[in-house]
Curated annotation (Swiss-Prot):
It is found in: Endoplasmic reticulum membrane. Keywords: Endoplasmic reticulum, Membrane, Transmembrane, Transmembrane helix. The lineage of its organism: Eukaryota, Fungi, Dikarya, Ascomycota, Saccharomycotina. It comes from the Eukaryota. The keyword Cytoplasm does not apply. Residues 1-6, 57-157 are cytoplasmic. Is probably involved in a pathway contributing to genomic integrity. It comes from Saccharomyces cerevisiae (strain ATCC 204508 / S288c). Residues 30-33 are lumenal. It is a multi-pass membrane protein. This is Increased recombination centers protein 23. Induction: Between 15 and 30 minutes due to fermentation progress.
Amino acid sequence: MIEALEIVLLLVIQSLQYICRTCIAFLLIPFLGLYAFDLFLYVYRMILYLSQMFNYKRKLGRSKTNNRPHSPRLHKIYSSGDCMDTLIGQVRDLRVFLLSTIHSHSKRFFSTRFQTKSGINSAIDANDVETTSDVSSFTNLHLTRSSEEGYYIAGSI
């Protein structure tokens, strides 16, 4: 009899745990939904830039080797330091470009997600730019841009 009560009590406690977990998840869905789409766009942009980087490197390697695939002059050109310096310079420029775009996108993503009340008030920031308290147009522009990018991504899939 006591074992049966323990089993029933255990089942009741487990079912209450599941009910509480589903209620918490149901309450968190709107809160997470506000950020999930922007996080998806951020991850999508990062993957897009990485694929462009690998595609660029692959095309760069093909353009260097496909000009004269069996030419003995090609080995002499590769053995000189000029070609390697050019190749290293192009890869370095690509890395600088990718780092700057990744930095700008991550800065935009995190600044729009985690705005604080102190940053909204009108003041002069470190770059001597006046910030105003009217951010409604910026928010509407950001939401419009996010929805347009969402339609673009949905259309391209």
